[in-house]
Amino acid sequence: NLYQFKNMVQCVGTQLCVAYVKYGCYCGPG
C-alpha cells in the first residue's frame, strides 16, 4: 500500500500525515 497507518509521532522524516484518524494517521512519502 502507498499509505501505511502509523501513530502520529511516527510521521516524521520523509513521511507526512495525509489523513487523520482516531488514533493516528495515514502516512505517505512527502
Curated annotation (Swiss-Prot):
pH-dependence annotation: Optimum pH is 8.5.
Protein's organism: Walterinnesia aegyptia (Desert black snake)
Reported function: Relatively highly potent phospholipase A2 that displays potent antimicrobial and hemolytic activities. It does not show cytotoxic effects on the three human cell lines tested. PLA2 catalyzes the calcium-dependent hydrolysis of the 2-acyl groups in 3-sn-phosphoglycerides. It shows similar potencies on both Gram-negative and Gram-positive bacteria: B.cereus (MIC>9 ug/ml), B.subtilis (MIC>12 ug/ml), E.faecalis (MIC>7 ug/ml), S.epidermidis (MIC>12 ug/ml), S.aureux (MIC>5 ug/ml), E.coli (MIC>7 ug/ml), K.pneumonia (MIC>8 ug/ml), P.aeruginosa (MIC>10 ug/ml), and S.enteric (MIC>9 ug/ml).
Gene3D superfamilies: Phospholipase A2 domain
Annotated EC: 3.1.1.4
Location in or out of the cell: Secreted
Name recorded for this polypeptide: Non-toxic phospholipase A2
Species classification: Eukaryota, Metazoa, Chordata, Craniata, Vertebrata
GO biological-process terms attached to the record: arachidonate secretion; defense response to bacterium; killing of cells of another organism; lipid catabolic process; phospholipid metabolic process
Residues annotated for Ca(2+) binding in this entry: 26, 28, 30
Subunit architecture: Homodimer.
